[in-house]
């Protein structure tokens, strides 16, 4: 309301019940002792874990996700986390659909693709929900079941990406990636579900903030650079019609070097990435 009165926002709207259920509290509105939090009009509620950081508690946001309630606490800390040891190693990463990440050292990493695994169950629960009467308790139960499955899919994806990005930041000092047009890729109806399932944007987000935390560097190559079609040995660029997406291995007509398409792309990304995304 304050921002509306100052002319910085539109007239506020009421949040509908059951949609994005959450509320915020300032540090004088709640109390935190060990694994318990005191919330106004609710009293003491048990928490699953203790506060992870020591510092001044600023605020709390209580929200519902996947049929469960969570609290997110904002904490002001005095010191930064311990930096990861320097390894003096660099790597280029080519993101793809068959293999989520191909590293310039030849390593190929496959993603779990949780949406693909749970798709049949997801369709079944969606069908069950559509058949329930609006406003009924059975519809609420069906909605909760569907919400829990969506949350589980999201957790599997994020857990895998957290482990992957943490490993990369621990192993390399300089990480080079490509600037993918994820929004444009999602518009392709044949690829949209697969792209969303892999989590390209989330991978980049995690990689950049973790590299910032530990004094590592993330670089990016422009999205129009032909990393797959350029020979990493001599720089010869193949014509688009001579190198289709179905071609996974190719031989450079100029220097006769044989390439794995994705490994070659990751080597080019390592050599050509120049835009620094991190603060370090």
What are the roles of these predicted feature ranges?
Residues 1-280:
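Nucleic-acid substrate recognition interfaces
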């Amino acid at each position: 309301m304050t921002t509306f009165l100052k002319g910085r926002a539109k007239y506020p709207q009421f949040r509908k019940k059951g949609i994005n259920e959450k509320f915020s509290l300032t540090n004088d509105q709640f109390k935190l002792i060990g694994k318990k939090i005191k919330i106004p009009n609710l009293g003491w509620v048990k928490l699953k874990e203790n506060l992870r950081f020591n510092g001044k508690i600023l605020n709390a946001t209580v929200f519902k996700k996947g049929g469960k309630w969570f609290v997110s606490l904002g904490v002001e800390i005095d010191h930064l986390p311990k930096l990861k040891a320097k390894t003096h190693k660099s790597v280029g990463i080519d993101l793809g659909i068959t293999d989520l990440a191909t590293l310039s050292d030849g390593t190929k990493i496959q993603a779990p693709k949780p949406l693909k695994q749970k798709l049949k169950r997801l369709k079944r629960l969606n069908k069950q929900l559509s058949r329930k009467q609006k406003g009924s308790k059975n519809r609420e139960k069906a909605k909760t079941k569907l919400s829990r499955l969506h949350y589980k899919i999201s957790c599997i994806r994020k857990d895998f990406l957290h482990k992957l990005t943490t490993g990369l930041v621990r192993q390399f000092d300089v990480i080079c990636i490509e600037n993918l047009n994820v929004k444009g890729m999602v518009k392709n109806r044949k690829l949209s579900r697969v792209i969303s399932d892999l989590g390209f944007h989330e991978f980049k987000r995690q990689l950049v903030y973790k590299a910032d935390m530990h004094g590592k560097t993330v670089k990016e190559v422009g999205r129009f650079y032909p990393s797959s079609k350029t020979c990493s040995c001599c720089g010869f660029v193949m014509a688009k019609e001579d190198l289709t997406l179905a071609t996974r291995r190719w031989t450079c007509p100029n220097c006769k070097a044989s390439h794995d398409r994705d490994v070659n792309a990751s080597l080019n990304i390592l050599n050509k990435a120049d835009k620094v995304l991190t603060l370090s």
